[in-house]
């Protein structure tokens, strides 16, 4: 449906019988109103054409071929705003055959039936509104009560019976005689309340505002009573208060949505459009039909039998009528939700029929698979892998996916730069995948963000925007810090990529949806982009240095503490200059040349730090050179002094891993400071 703001939306709820009839009814030029399905047939076995007034009737649901009626006549399809044109002979409207995807019909039921979703689903809406046990209502609906108390507010024969205390035995023999009389229908409608009619009358008599007031008053009274001192009584009161809350919420919902409670009892049963329950011919001439067609046929057969019993046979026993009403109720229940009342209905091959609920619910249902999960233009899907070289706001897009998603923009770029004269030439150049194509694609992607989504999208961080970067391979590369928001890992997860087309969508992606704009959890405010799994292991390997090497001697207290049983031979140990590096670039260059390892300890020249100079820490070892200079070795640093005890230089003990981590943090801080300065 489309609201007044021209927003397309889908709303599920109860509708009135008038609305159901309005969905299906069409008025022919001769004044005949069509829309009711009265026959359980589908196609004629000889002509292979839809049966009139059947489940695939062309008069009700529209022509099978566009502009061709059941007689075979053809007429040009006019504009939708023009008056509809019908065939004078068969009554089929000359419209597009796609109307059979949304044109509905209806079945006029011989007796009201309750909607099984509102009766049997927990919590039961009908039981909550009527404040009656579900077992009692089920017995009433399925005619298990051969005798039910009257619900009419006027005096009845049964109310009169209750005022007498004598002749009780005679009533047992006299009342059943009424079930076999010709006037049983009138007697039953006035005196006996059974079936879905009883539920409908009670729901129609409800005043939702009075229910709200009374439920609120009772809820307050139960809260003021206080504990009863008995656990069983306290739990009973608690359950009653919870029930009253649910009842008030349900009444508010009916008032807010302008839905009448009696609409939960069906008098007209909608019939789905034929294209949503098709019959397909397979190899060998065999036909495959949707299970819903068979369930509809079952309803129509039983409903027609009930109508015949009520109209043609006036002397039909009342028990037979109630039994047939129960069969109609069960047939509608099976159509809506097969198996909700226990044993599901099966076909001749012992296969369970798929009801309407089975068609729409679940991962493979109509909503999740066809409406919500359907493929859309300008979208792709692939496996995600880690991209360690990416920034937080970037994602790696495979060339094969990128050239398809941005093909329209690349074509415009080729024509704009006069590299192609038309769209056909541009597409042929794209198929050749020359170097100029990738250059134009790079330019297009620089100014166009993409959206990444991982199902299920449970919160807003399930869809985030990224700046695409071309990568080799066929997998989408993702920064590991954003995985927590998507609840993703790199064990085969797949993600969908979408291209925002409109300027509004691109602005929303840049201002609100970029990954570096969503660093905190929207629910509790905790950081959402935190290192996990591989990143923690990598940080540990990067910063866990081999502490033995520089100070592996008897004077190092750290070695005595960690290796008490290992003896260092003083005769074989002589001091040699450990790797000394003037800057971090030399240290990283030595690592790349494989002169040192990632965790090899080294001395890195450091700026003169007053905290180190003023430290009162005693050196672990002091080495003297022949020229008089000395090397004072401390736990984490080394000081080189001249003959006059002046500090010449300071070296800190570190590893290549620590240096790499420090440089990454320093570059990140400098980039953040530059961004802040540009912003101001």
Swiss-Prot record:
Binding sites annotated in the UniProt record for Mg(2+): 489, 491, 493
Key word Plastid present: yes
UniProt KW Plastid keyword: yes
SMART domains: RPOLA_N
Binding locations of Zn(2+): 69, 71, 87, 90
Gene Ontology terms, MF aspect: DNA binding; DNA-directed RNA polymerase activity; magnesium ion binding; zinc ion binding
Domain of life: Eukaryota
Localization (cell): Plastid, Chloroplast
EC number(s) stated in the UniProt entry for this protein: 2.7.7.6
Membrane spanning residue stretches: none
Keywords: Chloroplast, DNA-directed RNA polymerase, Magnesium, Metal-binding, Nucleotidyltransferase, Plastid, Transcription, Transferase, Zinc
UniProt remark on cofactor binding: Binds 1 Mg(2+) ion per subunit.
One term under GO cellular component: DNA-directed RNA polymerase complex
Reaction(s) catalysed (UniProt annotation): RNA(n) + a ribonucleoside 5'-triphosphate = RNA(n+1) + diphosphate
Any one GO BP annotation for this protein: DNA-templated transcription
Cofactor(s) this protein requires: Mg(2+); Zn(2+)
Pfam family, one: RNA_pol_Rpb1_1
Subunit structure: In plastids the minimal PEP RNA polymerase catalytic core is composed of four subunits: alpha, beta, beta', and beta''. When a (nuclear-encoded) sigma factor is associated with the core the holoenzyme is formed, which can initiate transcription.
Family per similarity comment: Belongs to the RNA polymerase beta' chain family. RpoC1 subfamily.
Role played: DNA-dependent RNA polymerase catalyzes the transcription of DNA into RNA using the four ribonucleoside triphosphates as substrates.
Annotated PANTHER family: DNA-DIRECTED RNA POLYMERASE (PTHR19376), DNA-DIRECTED RNA POLYMERASE SUBUNIT BETA (PTHR19376:SF54)
Protein name, entry field: DNA-directed RNA polymerase subunit beta'
Protein source organism: Citrus sinensis (Sweet orange)
Gene that this polypeptide is encoded by: rpoC1
